[in-house]
């Protein structure tokens, strides 16, 4: 596996699809969105998409809320988009045959607003994930402005199997790992807006935590894990980047720079998914029905008595 860095609602039941063998060329678009400037951010997305297509990427992933920036507060309604909006259609068209993940504020039914990310390939949107866990503690206040998503759901992607998306805080909750394992994901994509916290010498605590989570998820799921964070400043806070790819055995494959915008290309061998699952068949041995029964018992004890 190699990397190149260039500066710069009812769920449907789908048949399981095994990823094809061979390489998946991923582009990690570690950008610095401008807060509230949707047009400028759209242009930056189009620039990165053009480069990624020229470099032969199969998939490009942008950070959480990549079209808007993070600390939106009262301008959330002003920057929100419907998933059928012309701006999103423009991105999907520009990506062409390349798969695309980007973050946006989605306006849903009843004028509710969601921190969301969409996945598109071959000219159409296949999936939109709405962030389930909205941090509202410390410097975070998402529950004041966003509605929470209600599910974690995987989907079938052409050529590389089952894909799941989580957004930032979702990655910190064990329920997302449990559900994604039950969904038999092959590739887990986590889009992030994480500022640098817990700085001690050259190390950034949040960066170390995301790497630890990615390595843990990859081994539990036997999956390829992509984490894409942003860079830049908002409200005096620094977003550290350090986007990364971890293989299904928990090995760090590639990592983008800290603090700088970059477009990092990573060639991932999908055959490693099969090899790792033969060596460590955690998914095969998982007791899903027992887990469901135990959770139902806990639900009755905690919420129905």
Locate the predicted segments by residue:
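C-terminal beta-strand edge segments of enzyme domains
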Residues: 2-14, 216-305
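CN hydrolase (nitrilase-like) catalytic-core segments centered on the catalytic cysteine
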Residues: 83-102, 168, 172-263
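Active-site catalytic loop in hydrolytic enzyme cores
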Residues: 83-86, 108-212, 278-282
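Cys-nucleophile CN-hydrolase/nitrilase-fold catalytic domain and related Cys-dependent amidase chemistry
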Residues: 2, 38, 47-132, 194-223
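N-terminal active-site segment of His-dependent metallophosphoesterases
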Residues: 2-59, 189
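Short beta-strand scaffold segments in enzyme catalytic cores
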Residues: 102-104, 115-119, 153, 243-245, ...
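Fold-independent oxyanion-binding glycine-rich loops
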Residues: 31, 65, 103-105, 122, ...
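A structure-centric signal for secondary-structure junctions around beta-strands
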Residues: 21-23, 114, 240, 260
């Amino acid at each position: 596996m190699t990397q190149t860095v260039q500066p710069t609602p009812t769920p449907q039941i789908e048949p399981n699809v095994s990823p094809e063998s061979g390489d998946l060329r991923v582009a990690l678009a570690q950008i610095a969105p401008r807060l509230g400037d949707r047009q400028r951010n759209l242009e930056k997305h189009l620039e990165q998409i053009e480069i990624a297509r020229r470099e032969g990427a199969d998939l490009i992933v942008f950070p959480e809320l990549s079209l808007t920036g993070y600390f939106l507060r009262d301008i959330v309604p002003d920057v929100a988009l419907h998933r059928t909006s012309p701006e999103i259609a423009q991105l999907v068209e520009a990506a062409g045959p390349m798969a695309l993940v980007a973050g946006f504020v989605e306006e849903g039914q009843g004028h509710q607003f969601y921190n969301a990310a969409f996945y598109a390939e071959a000219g159409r949107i296949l999936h939109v994930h709405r962030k389930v866990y909205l941090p509202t503690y410390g410097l975070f206040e998402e529950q004041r402005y966003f509605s929470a998503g209600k599910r974690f759901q995987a989907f079938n992607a052409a050529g590389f199997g089952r894909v799941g998306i989580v957004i930032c805080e979702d990655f910190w909750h064990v329920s997302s790992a449990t559900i994604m394992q039950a969904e038999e994901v092959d590739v887990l994509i986590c889009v992030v807006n994480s500022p640098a916290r817990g700085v001690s010498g050259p190390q950034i605590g949040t960066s170390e935590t995301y790497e630890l989570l990615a390595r843990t998820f990859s081994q539990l799921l036997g999956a390829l894990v992509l984490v894409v964070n942003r860079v830049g400043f908002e409200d005096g806070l620094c977003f550290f980047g350090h986007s990364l790819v971890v293989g299904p055995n928990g090995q760090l494959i590639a990592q983008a720079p800290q603090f700088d915008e970059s477009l990092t290309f990573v060639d991932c061998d999908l055959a490693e998914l099969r090899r790792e699952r033969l060596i460590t068949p955690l998914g095969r041995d998982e007791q899903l029905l027992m887990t469901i029964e135990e959770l139902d018992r806990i639900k009755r004890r905690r919420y129905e008595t």
